[in-house]
Amino acid sequence: MIPLIPLAAVAAGAITTTYTVAIAREAKRPRRATYAWALAHHSAASPAEVPGVRTWHEGSTVLHTMGHTPAAHHTPAAHSTSPAHATPPSARSIVLPWWLVEGQGAGAMLLIHGWGRSRWDSLRRLPWLLEHAASIVVPDLRGHGEAPGTTSIGHSDHLDLDQVIQRADNASASGATNGGLTIVGHSMGAMVAARLAALLAARGTPARRLVLMAPYDSLIVPMANRLRVRGLPTGPFAASAAWWLARDEEPVHRTLARVQCPVLALGGGLDAVTTPDDVRRAAAPHETLIEPGIDHANVGVEGTASREALHAFLSRT
């Protein structure tokens, strides 16, 4: 019987390692929400199907390493009058596709989707935002939607989006930057939004305002909560995977201390991925509204109180 003890320990270790690696791998390679996802979920398949959208363009940004100027590709559709321009990407290029939607307000806005989602999911949040910006950039993050590569799980996406907003603004005919930049993010996108706002503040060009929908403070929060929702064990596994993927992660509440702009956080009372306590912890000490009856996927999509709070915040800032 004694030889069985080390054998059992080896087997337990192998199972633990395999499970932890599987958690990390899923986090890095989520299922993609593309055009087919939108059709399957009876969601808008393009900005043209969103009520209130009048004009929109489709484009993409070829990402370059720091110190290089990103190239933009503008793809005129039948509804677009802007010319195509840019240098063709190479086989090794990472190209982030985006939509540029003309709104009825002032300033520019960046709308960032969450983990495992895409710009198609962002279209669900567009109706609440159209009257508060002259132009809204709706991108796919790396490793999501139609963007190639693997996701950084929110840890370096702000660097990609820094390039995207520079190029998308050049494609806008609205002069949107005159009214400042509003950054809106959902779930993982909220983490990206906070980091981008901090980056812009450090550069001396702070964002006008920041909206965080279902934010979380660190990667362990959604990673562990998603396992619980699926009835899978969390134990030390989620913590180990999160440490592996985000060893140098700064909590979002610390990042927010550097953003230098008004912040609003929205959460849902039925959210099991980023619970109300998780939202408050991430956004403290900023204005936070938790609306009962709203789950994670529908924060920023449903809820009268949430919509009124968002409208009031965007109107006064």
Question: Where are these predicted regions, by residue range?
Answer:
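Catalytic histidine-centered segment of alpha/beta-hydrolase-like enzymes
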Residues: 294-307
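Conserved alpha/beta-hydrolase "acid-adjacent" motif
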Residues: 272-278, 299
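The serine-hydrolase catalytic nucleophile loop
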Residues: 115-128, 141
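Hydrolase active-site cap/lid region
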Residues: 195-248, 255
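An N-terminal hydrophobic leader/cap segment in hydrolases
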Residues: 2-67, 71, 77-78, 82-86
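Short beta-strand/loop motif that positions the catalytic acidic residue
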Residues: 258-259, 265-267, 271
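Alpha/beta-hydrolase active-site loop
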Residues: 151-172
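Conserved alpha/beta-hydrolase
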Residues: 129-148
